[in-house]
């Protein structure tokens, strides 16, 4: 639960930034974000005539902020569509934008690893809401060690709970808008429940032996858990390191042995590893088709038809169902 006067802030344990302190410190100096000694937590911004200025880290989080905030917020997004948040490097301009926002909304759970220092320091000065951090650990998948898989938006039921947490946080920052935030949170949760059922129906016709989703990185594990699909990524849950030859060979063996018909690339991740996987399978006599492009760590850009999470998940489900031979239209 959020304490009175305290907004859900990015937890130190959720960011591994020790190797990037020098870069982050320079950015913090540019933005004037040095921590204040003895700071006891962020204070809500003073009442203002216009909407709250919300800066979201990713397109997916920005969509959530718009859905919950409605006309009481003006949302900007730090990362453009198609950007990989795992490897995104903050710039001095990012520090300026973070410093002038009324509220910063992040995913957390290590997704924005290279923004760690900025977000943690900023959280001592103003509200930083990390929606993924509010989920019970029992609902999170492990990413190795003490880390959790950050791609929680791929389970609509979990994302609905993130929406509720954001509504609660915004209500504490902007009490006059509390009723509206709560109402929009309930409406969004209902729509995500409908979406969950639609995705489930769309995937139901995929034969059991073909319910294997092979992608560039392991972003779809929550999706797999929710819909009974085995998920295999050439890379792990983060894209900060390239897939090695051993990773490629392991996946080639799996694809060939199980006669997997299709693999998928992602909009925000290089397709090099998937291309190498297909070449390796072909060398073993098994042709693997390219099933299509999935939206993973970013929504589609303007005019793509996938500018919201709801649209993106529907598009992904249609692409997966078609490539894996679903009998459901």
Q: What do these predicted ranges mean?
A:
Residues 1-21:
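Short, intrinsically disordered or compositionally biased N-terminal tails of bacterial proteins
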Residues 15-16, 23, 30, 270:
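Short amphipathic alpha-helical "recognition" segments used for binding
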Residues 11, 15, 39-329:
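Extracytoplasmic metal-acquisition and chelation regions
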Residues 25-38:
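Bacterial N-terminal signal peptides
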